[in-house]
């Protein structure tokens, strides 16, 4: 660590914010927080010579593990109880191109790699079978529904597979050419949200949302389509949609370049689909309008991965952004590479590993800190080196070029401190 004191330490001090300060001969002063880090980082080592640190997908299983797709490196897993990484879990060469999505049941993992789905036995950690969608196209997402059927999205439409007599068989295929009322808005589909309570699937795409409503037998009754409309104020910000999560009756949807969308469906008596939407992005404090992964926490607030990691306060309707100095694995987070566990911890994968954390009720935590003056300059020269002990300053005419320096003397996440000031009897 280039910022740490190396040797010949001559003084140690613990300040009011639990920062430990260490001074050393000819080595300056170093400080570090002694508090537990809010963001915990797990670094990923490449699983092969051509491997990558990049986490391409994440999936939490009720067995207490987060299963992780490692680009060019198969599947690894993280024990959420012991907070330990187990690598490798399954690094069969068939998984090496790129794991795009993972699902699981009590006995198996289902892992999509390009154009195939591989079935891994949990106990032996070996691939026991595989199958391919009829379209033989690149797979973007797979999801198990209430009936333990596997839905697959590609750029050639939507397919559904069911296990029969030990074999996974195609039972449904839907495209933009399927007759109504089961026609999709487009063949180019991205991520699937399975709403088990309402027995329906909501799928993001390059042409808005497709909402599949199922009956009690699991048959698709209709597909409702929702698209952006530039003529209305409460519209989706874009039709090019990716990550999706839900809280109560509200869907939170990430876009590539058009921010975060809040979507509520309206079920009209005549069956016509409608919705209301609001969108948020850079104007509300986001670091970017690319929202590549979305997770709603236990308090109803939304965490977004993309360019760094952002927290969206749904009450204030503002973003708070976090970066490397907050302990993140890097500046880049993967597309839909996130999940949440049974305890409410959130996991976000990126270019060098992943971060996990337990959201709090209020983030960031507000605190009133006293500002201390530290230096005063007049025409570029230090005039009063002991300004912190001075109650008043007199600036004689015509000196009108001066600078005042101040600090809170708090080193607890100083990168997130914000200051406000006003001139009395001048500023309103």
Model-derived features with residue positions:
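Carboxylate-rich, polar loop motifs that coordinate divalent cations or form catalytic acidic clusters
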Residues: 1-428
């Amino acid at each position: 660590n280039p910022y740490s004191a190396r040797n010949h330490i001559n003084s140690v001090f613990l300040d009011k914010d639990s920062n430990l300060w260490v001074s050393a001969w000819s080595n300056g002063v170093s400080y570090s927080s002694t508090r537990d880090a809010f963001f915990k980082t797990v670094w990923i080592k490449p699983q092969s010579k051509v491997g990558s640190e990049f986490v391409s997908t994440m999936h939490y299983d009720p067995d207490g593990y987060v299963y992780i797709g490692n680009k060019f490196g198969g599947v690894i897993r993280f024990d959420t109880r012991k907070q330990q990484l187990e690598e490798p879990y399954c690094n069969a060469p068939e998984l090496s191109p790129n794991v795009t999505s993972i699902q699981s049941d009590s006995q198996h993992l289902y892992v999509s790699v390009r154009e195939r789905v591989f079935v891994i036995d949990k106990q032996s950690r070996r691939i026991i079978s595989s199958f391919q969608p009829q379209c033989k196209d690149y797979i973007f997402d797979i999801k198990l529904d209430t009936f333990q059927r596997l839905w697959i999205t590609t750029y050639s439409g939507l397919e559904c597979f069911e296990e029969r007599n030990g074999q996974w068989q195609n039972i449904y295929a839907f495209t933009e050419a399927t007759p109504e009322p089961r026609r999709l808005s487009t063949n180019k589909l991205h991520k699937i949200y399975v709403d088990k309570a309402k027995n329906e699937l909501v799928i993001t795409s390059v042409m808005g949302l497709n909402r599949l409503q199922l009956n009690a037998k699991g048959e698709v009754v209709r597909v409702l389509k929702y698209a952006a409309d530039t003529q209305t104020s409460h519209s989706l910000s874009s039709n090019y949609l990716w990550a999706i999560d839900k809280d109560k009756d509200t869907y939170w949807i990430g876009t590539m370049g058009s921010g975060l969308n809040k979507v509520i469906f309206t079920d009209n008596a005549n069956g016509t689909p409608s919705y209301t939407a609001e969108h948020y992005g850079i104007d509300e404090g986001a670091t970017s309008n690319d929202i590549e992964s979305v997770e709603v926490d236990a308090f109803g607030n939304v965490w977004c991965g993309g360019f760094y990691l952002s927290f969206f306060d749904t009450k204030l309707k503002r973003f708070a952004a976090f970066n490397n100095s907050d302990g993140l694995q890097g500046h880049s987070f993967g597309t839909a590479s996130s999940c949440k566990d049974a305890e409410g911890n959130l996991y976000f994968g990126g270019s060098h590993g992943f971060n996990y954390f337990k959201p709090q009720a209020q983030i960031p935590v507000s605190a009133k800190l006293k500002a201390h003056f530290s230096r005063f300059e007049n025409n570029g020269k230090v005039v009063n080196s002991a300004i912190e002990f001075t109650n008043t300053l007199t600036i004689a005419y015509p000196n009108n070029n001066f600078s005042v320096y101040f600090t809170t003397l708090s080193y607890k996440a100083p990168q997130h401190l914000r200051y406000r000031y006003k001139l009395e009897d001048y500023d309103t």
